Swiss-Prot record:
The keyword NAD does not apply. GO terms for molecular function: rRNA binding; structural constituent of ribosome. One of the primary rRNA binding proteins, it binds specifically to the 5'-end of 16S ribosomal RNA. One of its GO terms (cellular component) is cytosolic small ribosomal subunit. GO terms for biological process: translation. The keyword Transmembrane does not apply. This is Small ribosomal subunit protein uS17. SUPFAM superfamilies: Nucleic acid-binding proteins. Pfam families: Ribosomal_S17. InterPro entries: NA-bd_OB-fold, Ribosomal_uS17, Ribosomal_uS17_bact/chlr.
Length: 87
């Protein structure tokens, strides 16, 4: 099964080698037929502490690093390639 890749915005980089990424999704409400936005925060591993608050980043599903951290930051050119592949 392929690993999921999500795009989101960094909302916190306070942790050591950890970032918090807000991922927003849109869907049509089944009854109201209106587009609804929902967001969720994911803790992701940032090995080099390179991501800063406000940046748009890609995160990839991976093995658990801790109780809440099961995503890792996709670095540089790999992120652009993944974005083109997902689109």
């Amino acid at each position: 099964m392929p690993k999921r890749i999500l795009q989101g915005t960094v909302v916190s980089d306070k942790g050591e080698k950890t970032i918090v990424v807000k991922v927003e999704r849109r869907f049509t409400h089944p009854v109201m037929k209106k587009t609804v936005r929902r967001s969720k925060n994911y803790h992701a591993h940032d090995e080099g502490n390179v991501a800063k608050v406000g940046q748009t980043v890609f995160i990839e599903e991976c093995r658990p690093f801790s109780k809440t951290k099961t995503w890792k930051l996709v670095e540089g050119d790999a992120a652009q390639a993944e974005a083109g592949e997902a689109a």
